[in-house]
């Protein structure tokens, strides 16, 4: 299992115009039915996670980036038996048409 380089990821997201935050969730934790005005990125660092986006389930592996588009209904679940750690970032640079 490859470890996620937190500092490298944070710097990469900053370059791409995203914020950076960390969640550590207990087994069974559910963040249900969220919608944001901006795009979001999620990367699992430890444990297991399920990300449901507009009714479609994704099970990213550690280090795999998951994109959640702006205005998409989404739910995040810790599906494992241990705490998980995941990084999230919101698009901070506004793009104009």
How would you label these PLM feature ranges?
Residues 1-13:
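Extreme N-terminal tail/first-helix region
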Residues 6, 19-36:
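Conserved short histidine dyad/triad with adjacent acidic residue
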Residues 27, 37, 56, 72-73, ...:
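A generic "binding-loop/recognition-motif" signal
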Residues 10-12, 30-36, 77-79:
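Short histidine-centered beta-strand/loop micro-motifs
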Residues 70-97:
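Ligand-binding loop in jelly-roll beta-barrel domains
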Residues 55-70:
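Short acidic-glycine-tyrosine-enriched beta hairpin
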Residues 16, 52-56:
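Short strand-coil-strand connectors
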Residues 35-51:
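Short, conserved beta-strand element in jelly-roll/cupin
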């Amino acid at each position: 299992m490859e470890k996620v380089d937190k500092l490298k990821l944070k710097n990469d997201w900053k370059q791409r115009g995203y914020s950076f935050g960390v969640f550590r969730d207990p087994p069974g934790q559910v963040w249900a039915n969220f919608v944001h005005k901006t795009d979001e990125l999620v990367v699992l660092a430890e444990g297991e996670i399920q990300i449901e986006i507009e009714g479609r389930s994704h099970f990213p592996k550690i280090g795999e980036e998951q994109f959640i588009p702006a205005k998409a209904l989404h739910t995040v679940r810790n599906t494992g038996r241990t705490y998980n750690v995941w990084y999230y970032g919101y698009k901070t640079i506004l793009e104009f048409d």
